[in-house]
Amino acid sequence: MGELGPASAQHGSDSISFSGSYTQPLGAPQPPNEPHAISVSLPTWEAVTAVMAGADWAICQLQTSYPRFDIHKCVRELHDAVLARFKHPAHTVCRAFPSPEAAERFVSRLQREDPILSVHTARFHLPHDAVPELAKWAAFSVVLFNESLEEVAFEFWEWFGDGISSRHAEFCLTQFSFLNTGSDQPEYQTVGQDSHDLSAMNLPEWIDSSTKDKMDIKSRLASSATSADPALKPMGNDDVLLYATGMAAISAIARALARTSDDSGAVVYGWPYSGTPHCVQGCGFKRYTMYGHGSKADLDSLETLLVSETRFTVLFCEITSNPQLSTPDLHRIRDLADRFGFIVVCDDTLGTSVNVDILPYVDVIITSLTKIFSGAGNVMGGSLMINPNSGHYSTLRALLTTTYEDLYFPLDAKTIARNSSDFAARVHKCNKSALQIANLLNSHASVESVNYPTMVPTAPLYERYRRPDGGYGFLLSVIFREPESAVLFYDKLDVWKGPTVGTNFSISIPYSALAHAKEQDWAASHGVPKHIVRLSVGLEDYGDLSERVNRALREVELREKMG
């Protein structure tokens, strides 16, 4: 990829173009040379399936991974330091969390899996004379557990987004020798090796600026989400809550609403991000229903259930769905919500508030800031916005703010604030290129169909919510007539390849093979074919990107002619 460094990956809304190959070697971080990269290169279909199957030849080449899918190097180093402090207890592993509450939720999940095995916690913290702002971010909690519970531990890490971030772990390592530990187990009560007058330590610049950075993010989100309808109250900065990941935001609202009733229930409508159903199901609702087709028939079934006096607390949906790019009927969902008293939570990560105006129809908006809001592919983040026009506004604010703790690490916030300064301009550019690429693919004889908001059956619904100056988003997926053509197209497509979407550089993945590796038949029954290829369109010059797509298509044509 040439000498592309982090600065290039954080390029603004101008076109990106350079000579050489975009595709990175297997296992390389994306962006290249970025210590906090959130994607890893999976350059061939074979590599994707091998990694998901745990094949040693592929796994051993991975230099990093999406932070919720694995343990980042900085976090692993923190885990190693913790185990070394505690003299490496036999068959014991650990996970680090920014708060005791997150650690306790993890403990509860492990104990549900195996009530017999011992699980212990410890809190690392600076001595009491430390500057409070420094002490807040140097502290973290760990859970120590038997290695036999690793599979469950990884599921929790992936689905709930509560783990410590890589930058936070990196900072904690710089303070590690000063940290004491507290625990209900004597063997986990320790004193730091170093000591000096911590009250005299200078605060890092990023701690001083964190309040402004977070306010900039909130202001940008609130302004973008505000409805064009002048009769509606604008979204306020105080209505925006920031989280370390998008999944942490989803789990926060799900936990809060699950506790509101002894008979709480949740609906997931449409085909969501693969982790969302697991997250919602794991947050304590007494009843859970998924309507995975996101169709009119699904809404008819939901209405029939509601009329029969089955009640739900909340409905989760996405605009648009991933990877079908379908749009939910928010008008009808809003009508059902008003009639039967449930809350509507909508994830707008793919549609973006730049493109769609959903405030008139939803009570809560969730956004993964990791994706196009950041764009640079070097930081995680999530947000939850409470609609000030919602009839549930006071209840939601009370539920969420009374338990909210700001755990968004200041350096992550600073990175997001810098990356998102041209958010709207980048969305508009990606909209334009993605529409052109979707049309290019859709016109090709080897392609059976393209999923893009203009090309799927819900296109009229998307138009109802599209802002006057909004486009159709940066994401599309393509289904080839022949599975072998899909594999060849992916292998020959010269773009970044790996997990995540919304990066400033185009990035592709065989979606079902990655997100539904163990449930591909089930996913196919809901409109996600095994050989679907997802493409997130970035800021590259359209002529450059279209030529790369056309080169891959020419390889497909040649294979099909040769038989």
From Swiss-Prot:
Q: Give the reactions, separated by semicolons, that this protein catalyses.
A: cyclo(L-arginyl-(Z)-dehydro-3,4-dihydroxytyrosyl) + O-acetyl-L-homoserine = cyclo(L-arginyl-(Z)-dehydro-4-O-homoseryl-tyrosyl) + acetate + H(+)
Please tell me whether the keyword Mitochondrion is annotated for this protein.
Answer: no
Give the matching InterPro entries. Cys/Met-Metab_PyrdxlP-dep_enz, PyrdxlP-dep_Trfase, PyrdxlP-dep_Trfase_major, PyrdxlP-dep_Trfase_small, Trans-sulfuration_enzymes
- Tell me a Gene Ontology molecular-function term this record carries: cystathionine gamma-synthase activity
Please state the Enzyme Commission number of this protein. Answer: 2.5.1.-
Function comment: Cystathionine gamma-synthase-like protein; part of the ank cluster that mediates the biosynthesis of NK13650 C, a highly modified cyclo-arginine-tyrosine dipeptide. AnkD catalyzes the attachment of L-homoserine moiety using O-acetyl-L-homoserine as co-substrate. Within the pathway, the cyclodipeptide synthase ankA acts as the scaffold-generating enzyme and is responsible for formation of the cyclo-Arg-Tyr diketopiperazine (cRY) from L-Arg and L-Tyr. The ankA product cRY is desaturated by the cytochrome P450 monooxygenase ankB to yield a dehydro-cyclodipeptide intermediate.
Q: What is this protein called?
A: Cystathionine gamma-synthase-like protein ankD
Native organism = Aspergillus thermomutatus
Q: What is the lineage of its organism?
A: Eukaryota, Fungi, Dikarya, Ascomycota, Pezizomycotina
| Gene name as annotated | ankD
